[in-house]
């Protein structure tokens, strides 16, 4: 194997030199060449790719005929909650529908991680298409919703928190992509306005921000959708949202593994950065929780729906935040036990195995495409008789 080729100027779509990807860091190594998946530095990313592919679905598989008539029966408060959440979810998945590929993909050094992020971005696009599908089937004029997403200041305020870390990294990474800074001899060059560690710090903050987005920011909206369905309202939409929730959990796990690999020393410099950014990361969690609580108050400003209000949602967001922080090795900071879900009835919507439906009635969430058990041995069926 040879080192990164010095004759490559800037980025390349295909590295023609032999680079051992199993010895590369996850990001900012040599450009990728052959997409080979027979060997992986981190098999967990290949496993996540297979898992996400097995969950593939399309919104058109779910009938929304009843949802159209259900929506007409909702009062103004319920319509405000349903529509506002749709608008915000569209914004989040518009960001995630292009963010991973646009920001992280160009600087990825492992084929198995590149593959996982490609599927991740594809599924986010399906989520965005799903919201359009819901809107087209529920509202007489879809433009009344879609044309006014960026007119809502509450949504724009949250959008800034979601996109700022992405944008800061994208702008800083431009010099890397347009130069030879990925080469060891060019890093930290005197002509560079920043060091490679500065750039990696922005990458960490972007990934940490996405981890929080995937793990917390959707869940107020999810809970509201499931609350309607518990009342036998907007059940088709809730079914689609449950597919999305299942996917987002996979994306959350992907970002958790990226951060954990950094913590374990995938890149020694990133390991230092993760430790240095601990307090800042905790502040990012706090800011997200505060914003989600404010969003819950905005949703329920004119009243509640049966089984759900802004107080319960605030407790739910704190509980989720504690879980997400614990998964990254941080101590929980909110007075919510990890064992006690404030909204236990949401769990069977988020866990696809908890939903029992007849195949002819709706899309079955627990059905996996291409799911194979590959640990069959010679004597596995020795006790079987025909």
List each language-model region with its residue ranges.
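Non-heme di-metal
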Residues: 2-386
């Amino acid at each position: 194997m040879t080192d990164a080729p010095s004759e490559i100027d800037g980025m390349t779509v295909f590295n023609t030199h032999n680079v051992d990807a199993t010895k590369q860091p996850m990001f900012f190594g040599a450009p990728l060449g052959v997409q080979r998946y027979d060997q992986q530095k981190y098999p967990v990313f290949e496993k996540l790719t297979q898992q996400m592919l097995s969950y593939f679905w399309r919104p058109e598989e779910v009938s929304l005929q009843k949802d159209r008539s259900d929506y007409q029966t909702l009062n103004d408060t319920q319509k405000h909650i349903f529509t506002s959440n749709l608008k915000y979810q569209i914004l989040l998945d518009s960001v995630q529908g292009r963010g991973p590929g646009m920001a992280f993909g160009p600087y990825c050094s492992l084929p198995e991680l590149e593959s996982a992020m490609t599927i991740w971005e594809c599924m986010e696009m399906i989520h965005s298409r799903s919201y359009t599908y819901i809107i087209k089937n529920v509202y007489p004029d879809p433009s009344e919703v879609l044309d006014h997403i960026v007119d809502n200041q509450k949504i724009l305020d949250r959008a800034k928190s979601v996109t700022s870390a992405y944008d800061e990294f994208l702008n800083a990474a431009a010099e890397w992509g347009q130069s030879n800074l990925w080469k060891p001899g060019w890093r930290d060059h005197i002509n560079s306005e920043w060091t490679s560690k500065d750039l990696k710090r922005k990458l960490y903050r972007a990934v940490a921000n996405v981890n929080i987005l995937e793990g917390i920011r959707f869940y107020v909206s999810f809970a509201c959708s499931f609350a309607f369905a518990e009342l036998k309202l907007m059940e088709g939409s809730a079914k689609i949202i449950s597919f999305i929730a299942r996917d987002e959990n996979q994306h959350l796990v992907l970002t958790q593994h990226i951060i954990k690999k950094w913590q374990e020393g995938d890149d020694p410099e990133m390991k230092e950065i993760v430790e240095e950014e601990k307090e800042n990361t905790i502040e990012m969690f706090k800011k997200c929780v505060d914003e989600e609580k404010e969003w819950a108050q905005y949703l329920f400003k004119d009243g509640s729906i049966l089984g759900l209000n802004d107080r319960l949602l605030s407790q739910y967001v704190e509980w989720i935040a504690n879980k997400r922080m614990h998964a990254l090795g941080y101590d929980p900071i909110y007075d919510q036990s990890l064992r006690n879900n404030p909204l236990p009835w949401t769990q069977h919507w988020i866990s696809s195995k908890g939903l029992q439906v007849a195949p002819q009635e709706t899309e079955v969430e627990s059905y996996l495409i291409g799911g194979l058990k590959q640990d069959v041995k010679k004597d596995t069926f020795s006790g079987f008789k025909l």
